[in-house]
Amino acid sequence: MDKVMRMSSEKGVVIFTKSSCCLCYAVQILFRDLRVQPTIHEIDNDPDCREIEKALVRLGCANAVPAVFVSGKLVGSTNDVMSLHLSGSLVPLIKPYQSFHN
C-alpha cells in the first residue's frame, strides 16, 4: 500500500489504469477534455501489479482500475468520477490542475 500512496501523491491528478481497460481510457479522456493532463500508471506494466490492485481495493476502489487520485486523495473509480462530474463537483476539485493550453 505504501507504493500506491507514494505514486498517488507524486502529481496533482494520478490515474491507475490497465492498458486493456476501456473504462480507464474513458476516464483519461474525460480529464483531458477538462484540460487536465493526469499522470497515468498502467499497472499491468508494473511487476507489482497484483499488490497494487489489492492495495487499491483496500483503499476503497470498487474495482482496482481505474483508480483516480486528486491531491493524493482517492476520488474513486469510474462511477465515482462520473457522479462527481455530473453533479458539478469534479471541476472545482481539479481546478488547480487545469491547463488553459491544450
Swiss-Prot record:
Residues 1-101 form the Glutaredoxin domain. Pfam families: Glutaredoxin. CDD domains: GRX_GRXh_1_2_like. Its main location: cytoplasm. GO terms for cellular component: cytoplasm. InterPro entries: GlrX-like_pln_2 (IPR011905), Glutaredoxin (IPR002109), Glutaredoxin_subgr (IPR014025), Thioredoxin-like_sf (IPR036249). Disulfide bonds join 21-24. Belongs to the glutaredoxin family. CC-type subfamily. NCBIfam families: GlrX-like_plant. This is Glutaredoxin-C14.
